[in-house]
Amino acid sequence: MASSFNEETAKKLLTQVEFYFSDSNLPTDGFLNREVTKSKDGLVSLPLVCSFSRMRNLLGLGNINREDIPPRIVEEVANLLRTSDFLKVSNNGQRIGRGTKLSKPEEVLEQVHRRTLAASPFEYSIKMEDVSSFFSQYAKVNSVRLPPNIADKRRFCGTALVEFSSEQDTQDILRQSLVYAGADLVLIPKSDFDCQRENMIKQLGKSESHNEFRRGQIVKFALKWIASEEKVTNKEKPSALKNKIKEKEDKETGIADREKENGDNSCASLCKDNTDQLVVPPWNNSNSVSSEVLKDLFQRFGSVEHIEYSGGLDSGYVWFTDSETAMKARAAVEFVGGLVVKNNFSVALEAINGEMERELWKRLSSAELEGGKEGHKKEKGKDECFENVQPTKKARKEP
């Protein structure tokens, strides 16, 4: 029976099916590997293989179910696959598989990794066929993979993984200086790529965890100016404050429950009224408080993520690394009736609730990631995408 496939389509179909059952793919293809393993003769349904997305595209079948694939198409594909020295087709043309049994998957994967290199940069719209065609000029290519960006799985990361037919070919290519579309290609072993990518995934995980919104971490603080001629009655030495905080820890849970029920309590409800204090806006005093001083103050209770405060204002926000620390700070400040800063200011804390808390979190997150204004600065360069990571070897442009 004459095939209806043209030469180009026939070549692509044969290459695709050989890839499905190859050492490069089968050990890591969970679905197909299970189908092969549970089959006594190692063969699987050819209509099933024809229903794979790339096969459907090559066959022009659209979104058809395997049960609805015309028998004529399956027969033509079977006849085409019989020309392969690598594949085995059943007598009835309904089943397909490898001609030889797959070796131990662990050993096969190790060999594949040694035959593979990572090449970059490639444009994000590039096709696997283009990469394969380019490297086929230098050695036989077994397979090409285009890994997704770790931060956006819908996009190509810019680095192609190219497997050659032998480890020696791979080593020879790594020593060459190649140029693609006017760009010097960076060539590194796959093992280096895997290490760099793993580090990027870890950093991204830390970043996502860090940027996850959690209630109760952000607290508003208010400053009251204490007249110099008045006696400060609530000044606490650091050691005394720590002792009072410790004494208060057993009562924190109850305080937190009351605060949740009365989340809109004013600052005055958290800081005792004191007749010794005269409320005067801090900006009228030359000894205004800096964000660094406030950060040192709040770090008595635990780690502080960010401080939003401009000198001269009478309020700001402190972002603790966890809600437990924020609760401890609020409970302790309420217990001692307000903290005293530089002998001139009393600091009271107030809960933030509802949508306002989420909006503040978005704003403080952006400021913290940008390095902040007067708050603590985050080390930059940790969350860059893999394609920006400096490789271990850089290819130079050909003369």
Curated annotation (Swiss-Prot):
Residue ranges of domain xRRM in the record: 269-399
Main location: nucleus
Matches recorded under InterPro entries: La_dom_prot, La_HTH, La_xRRM, Lupus_La, Nucleotide-bd_a/b_plait_sf, RBD_domain_sf, RRM_dom, WH-like_DNA-bd_sf
One Gene Ontology term from the biological process aspect of the record: tRNA 3'-end processing
Bias (Basic and acidic residues) ranges: 370-385
Tissue specificity comment: Expressed ubiquitously (at protein level).
CDD domains according to UniProt: LA_like_plant (cd08030), RRM2_La_like (cd12292)
Listed Pfam families: La (PF05383), RRM_1 (PF00076), RRM_3 (PF08777)
Keyword flag RNA-binding: yes
Keywords: Nucleus, RNA-binding
GO molecular function, one term: RNA binding
Subcellular location as annotated: Nucleus, Nucleoplasm; Nucleus, Nucleolus
RRM domain boundaries: 115-192
Domain HTH La-type RNA-binding positions: 3-106
GO cellular component: nucleolus; nucleoplasm; ribonucleoprotein complex
Family matches, as SUPFAM superfamilies: RNA-binding domain, RBD, Winged helix' DNA-binding domain
Region (Disordered): 367-399
Reported function: Binds to the 3' poly(U) terminus of nascent RNA polymerase III transcripts, protecting them from exonuclease digestion and facilitating their folding and maturation.
Name of the protein: La protein 2
Gene: LA2
